[in-house]
Design a protein with these regions (language model features):
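C-terminal, surface-exposed recognition/capping segments
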Residues: 3-7, 24-33, 52-170
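Eukaryotic nuclear/nucleolar intrinsically disordered, charge-dense low-complexity regions
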Residues: 39, 47-54
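A short, polar/charged loop-to-alpha-helix boundary motif
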Residues: 34-44
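Generic detector of bulky aromatic hydrophobic side chains
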Residues: 14-18, 36, 132-133
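Short, well-ordered junction/capping motifs at the entry into regular secondary structure
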Residues: 1-21
Length: 170
């Protein structure tokens, strides 16, 4: 029924955005520029210009700085620790709904999964072999899926991943 369908959009009309609660982890054009092989293997079209890793954001891609070293300058190999370090390294970045909707240190609970975004949405900052941002969550995340949820991803395909088309007005 079209009338009931319209009620589920953000505007209440057929022109609104549907399914803001998350049914898949939505891929984004955002990553930490840590040089991990998955950036080239899974995201060369957005992360590389020829053989050069893009380390600055563009009109269509958001690039985050990274800090995957411990206090002694050694490379961190634990993804949860690296996730926390990268979250801290990006503490001055606003406008992407990560800091604005997060009340804690993403990805830093004891088991590496954190629910510190608004309404206890899932939050884990990209790091190491999972340098890409995904948003939203899927049905397996239950009430932790939502508009404020974000996660790290390797860039590989999986059954609960998708994307959202975005129209850019020129």
């Amino acid at each position: 029924n079209q009338k009931n369908g319209q009620a589920s959009s953000t505007t209440g009309t057929i022109y609104g955005v549907y399914d803001m609660s998350g049914t898949v982890w939505e891929r984004t054009a955002a990553y930490v520029a840590n040089g991990n092989g998955n950036l080239r293997g899974q995201g060369a079209s957005i992360a590389y210009n020829g053989n050069t890793l893009k380390t600055e954001s563009t009109k269509y891609t958001t690039v985050y700085p990274f800090n995957e070293k411990d206090s002694e300058g050694n490379a961190i190999t634990n993804i949860d620790t690296a996730s926390q370090q990268n979250f801290v390294a990006n503490s001055k970045i606003y406008g992407d709904a990560v800091r604005e909707t997060n009340s804690g240190k993403a990805g830093t609970s004891e088991d590496g999964w954190n629910y510190s975004s608004w309404t206890s949405d899932y939050s884990s900052f990209p790091a190491l072999g999972s340098p890409f941002f995904t948003r939203g969550g899927n049905l397996l995340n239950g009430s932790s899926a939502g508009v404020c949820a974000f996660d790290r991803n390797s860039g590989g395909s999986y059954y609960f991943g998708g994307f959202r088309a975005v129209l850019v007005n020129k």
